[in-house]
């Protein structure tokens, strides 16, 4: 059984459940919440790498990242993103971005599993809805956007 708690902002919902055991009906509700709210959050989950990937496969084919080293040969799709206090320079993915958008066939969904979470306000991962952003644009800008193309690149 899952419980869906919509975020008070315009995007996202917290899902209360145990991801180690859920039914087909629960999965339908998870997917429905994902489509409705754009991003879903699961707090206090204790998943092994194998359980994490098993859960991820419910949402489609797993992506490989040829430029990034996976956790291990057994789990190449799990990319460890970490920053130590002693690290210098820009953080991986610190600027606004859409995961994997630069690939030929980007995955429909992205998952992030936090093992160590910094104190609130010290390092924030934020989410936004491009659907809502577009919806609130003036008509003249929407019309202009229909005539142009964007090129995505991870080259910088």
Language model region names:
Residues 2-156:
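Non-heme Fe(II) oxygenase catalytic core, chiefly the N-lobe of the double-stranded beta-helix
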């Amino acid at each position: 059984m899952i419980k869906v708690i919509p975020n008070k902002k315009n995007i996202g919902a917290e899902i209360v459940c145990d991801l180690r055991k859920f039914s087909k009906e629960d999965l339908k509700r998870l997917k429905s919440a994902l489509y409705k709210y754009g991003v879903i959050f699961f707090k206090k989950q204790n998943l092994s790498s194998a359980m994490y990937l098993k859960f991820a496969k419910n949402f489609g084919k797993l992506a490989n990242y040829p430029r990034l080293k996976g956790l291990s040969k057994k789990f190449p799709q799990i990319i460890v993103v970490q920053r130590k206090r002693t690290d210098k320079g820009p953080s991986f993915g610190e600027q606004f971005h859409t995961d994997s958008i630069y690939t030929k066939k980007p995955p429909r969904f992205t998952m992030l599993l936090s093992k160590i979470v910094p104190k609130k306000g010290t390092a924030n991962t934020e989410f936004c809805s491009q659907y809502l952003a577009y919806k609130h644009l003036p008509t003249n800008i929407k019309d202009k956007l229909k005539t142009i193309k964007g090129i995505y690149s991870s080259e910088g």
